[in-house]
């Protein structure tokens, strides 16, 4: 079978700490197929963006591994979200991450009825 990881990104980030980060990052990097669900809904910070997300995406880009993203944000909005940290508006680190997202994924807008409550 194919190793697939569906990761609710905000939950992953909220559960992540410095001590367990390397183990999680290596496991996610090794997945044959990765789906990062609800990216952009997490509490962003520079460490998560630069040391977690960028490292995962860089590996997946270099290995040409299938990577999917779901988000309520358009690419431009996601870039702005990634730029906003407590320290400042860090547009260049966010642009580096977004270059990897754009390499790995094509933006597709899905519209329709929210069926979560049906």
Predicted regions, residues:
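Short, basic, glycine/proline-bearing loop/turn elements
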Residues: 38-42
